UniProtKB/Swiss-Prot annotation:
This is Adenine phosphoribosyltransferase. GO terms for cellular component: cytoplasm. PROSITE patterns: PUR_PYR_PR_TRANSFER. One of its GO terms (molecular function) is adenine phosphoribosyltransferase activity.
Amino acid sequence: MNLKDYIATIENYPKEGVTFRDISPLMADGNAYSYAVREIVQYATDKKIDMIVGPEARGFIVGCPVAFELGIGFAPVRKPGKLPREVISADYEKEYGVDTLTMHADAIKPGQRVLIVDDLLATGGTVKATIEMIERLGGVVAGCAFLIELDELKGREVIGDYDYKVLMHY
């Protein structure tokens, strides 16, 4: 299945000069959505994953069904002020400054093998901050999976030696 057939391209959104890749049509098509989830589940199967971690918001959309299919838990990564219990945080650079991500301080147990799942790998800032928090909690990042990679933004360089899977390249 060619998943790119289910990605809408919106020029100059959210600002002039940006090409936005919208996964909404993929999610709206049960066959395409299921296919994408199964591809990530297949990638994860041999990695002995204990926990899926997904950054808000579209990491939830992709990561939760993967966790469900694998029969394991899901831990959310959120912006500050969105999680009710004790959190840890990591900063990451954005185009115009610094932003922060958080996760519950007890989300990952030492030694747990974690797969990070998100919709998009762009500059790599989100995944870098997520990796930092998982490792601070003693987790092992066994891999990363993305629906889309924007190749020209070089997020792959931020991932470095971590194993990863991408379903579509732009």
